[in-house]
Amino acid sequence: MIKLKDLIKEEVSMSQLNQVEKYLDKIWAKVGIDVEFTRHFHDRVNDERNKKPINTAELIRIYREIYKKYGKQISQLSNGVELLLKDMSTDINVPVVLKWDGKEFDMIAKTVMRKKNFKSRTKKYSV
């Protein structure tokens, strides 16, 4: 017997995450940044510790709003810099690292979590 809570639980598939990544690449390409999601990021998007599941619209929103507010500033940072993308309205936190691949920066999302009062020593970019 299928339980209602199992039907409501909406996991983000790897295919959906790839589509989100392609969409965000088009936005961030304007400042020379390629968005990358790791396997761990995918696993953590669907982690039950998030309480409320993280959905694709929330991921798009945080990256799009961070781009609008800080895109040019982030594109001027140096290779290897770690930073935290933070959405205050959804409590979503995305620690990322910038890596130069020879032609553009890769913004590699190491993980993602929904957590109030997330602590990090890296520079925070909040929306």
Can you annotate each of these PLM segments?
Residues 2-127:
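Ribonuclease/tRNase effector modules and their secretory precursors
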